[in-house]
Amino acid sequence: MSGSSGTPYLGSKISLISKAQIRYEGILYTIDTDNSTVALAKVRSFGTEDRPTDRPAPPREEIYEYIIFRGSDIKDITVCEPPKAQHTLPQDPAIVQSSLGSASASPFQPHVPYSPFRGMPPYGQLAASSLLSQQYAASLGLGAGFPSTPVGKSPMVEQAVQTSSVDNLNAKKLLPSKVTSATQLNGRQAQPSSKPASDVVQPAPVHTQGQVNDENRRPPRRRSGNRRTRNRSRGQNRPTNVKENTIKFEGDFDFESANAQFNREELDKEFKKKLNFKDDKADKGEEKDPAVMAQSEETAAEEDLLGPNCYYDKSKSFFDNISSELKTSSRRTTWAEERKLNTETFGVSGRFLRGRSSRGGFRGGRGNGTTRRNPTSHRAGTGRV
């Protein structure tokens, strides 16, 4: 590296030529001896500038916030300007941050170190080693120095450098939203401002204790309401095109053959003939045929088997013979009897019936918001059973 040995290189304006014969100018920010990289801030590419190369590159107007150069791909480094003298406060641990007036040419100097993505800190506050810059980047979660994602689109630049433009930096949103310093990107002085930057992500709103408590109480009610909605709508969202198992019939139903098996009229006629024949024989006192007697005995035996306690006989009727109120009592029960039966069955109900004492009990006055008690309504609506 050319330049006098006593020149403080950090903060100096550096002219760097890569092996691709492309010249860059920027401010030296850090030299990483472990990774063999050099980082420049506020970098501009001047192209190949008539240097002999197979792939010439034109100059570019963009100013990059930073570019990290690989040491093995650097051809020459020249110090163009030494760092400007910085008139800063002494390193006092009692100072949290400071700001000069608008008449001063020195920008706002925060005491807390940060990365040079949004304006570099004064180089008088930096040490000459790369360890300090690594600590800055580590505090922002940026690894050893800077992000390693190459952004430069030129094939010449991609071989030797890793770049990031201002637009790409704005897209990444790496900085806090509140900018309370007067740091500027183009060298012009700006007033201290506490307004949020337009290209930075806005912070989450700070909730007070009352708001946090309200937010902690409200979601369970929403979830319970949604649960009730789901319970009410259960079964309504079922698909309507579900096909049930249907029975397929090959032909029409034969009613004649089915009725022949269950011909109720013929069975009733035969049964009546047997009863009438037996009654006639008994009335006339005629001698009974032994075959008829045997048949009548079988019928009587069948009736005895059924017995008087046979409450249901499907051959005789669909209905049973269990006693009911229609058979036992011919008259309707009165309201008092039904109430007595309910009391014996379910017990005594509550003494005060709901809603009786509220009939005419209170009447609101018009306009004054007062209430008036009706003296007769309380006696009329005692609610006694």
From Swiss-Prot:
BP GO terms, sorted: maternal mRNA clearance; meiotic cell cycle process involved in oocyte maturation; membraneless organelle assembly; oogenesis; ovarian follicle development; regulation of translation
Record domain DFDF: where: 241-277
Modified residues (Omega-N-methylarginine): R351
Residue numbers spanned by region Disordered: 180-248, 357-385
Reported phenotype of the disruption mutant: Female mice are infertile, whereas male fertility is not affected. Oocytes display impaired early embryogenesis, defective progression to meiosis II and disrupted assembly of P-body-like granules. Show a reduction in the extent of mRNA storage in germinal vesicle oocytes, as well as an aberrant mRNA clearance during meiotic maturation of oocytes. Primordial follicle assembly is severely compromised in ovaries.
Keyword entries, A-Z: Acetylation, Cytoplasm, Developmental protein, Differentiation, Isopeptide bond, Meiosis, Methylation, Oogenesis, Phosphoprotein, Ribonucleoprotein, RNA-binding, Translation regulation, Ubl conjugation
Phosphoserine modified-residue sites: S106, S115, S154, S165, S329, S349
Xref: CDD domains: LSm14_N (cd01736)
Stretches with biased composition (Polar residues): 180-196
Cell compartment(s), UniProt: Cytoplasm, Cytoplasmic ribonucleoprotein granule
Motif (FFD box): 310-326
Keyword Ribonucleoprotein found: yes
Modified residues (N-acetylserine): S2
Position(s), cross-link Glycyl lysine isopeptide (Lys-Gly) (interchain with G-Cter in SUMO2): K248
Function description: mRNA-binding protein essential for female fertility, oocyte meiotic maturation and the assembly of MARDO (mitochondria-associated ribonucleoprotein domain), a membraneless compartment that stores maternal mRNAs in oocytes. Ensures the proper accumulation and clearance of mRNAs essential for oocyte meiotic maturation and the normal progression from Meiosis I to Meiosis II in oocytes. Promotes the translation of some oogenesis-related mRNAs. Regulates the expression and/or localization of some key P-body proteins in oocytes. Essential for the assembly of the primordial follicle in the ovary.
Protein name: Protein LSM14 homolog B
Lineage, uppermost ranks: Eukaryota, Metazoa, Chordata, Craniata, Vertebrata
This protein's encoding gene: Lsm14b
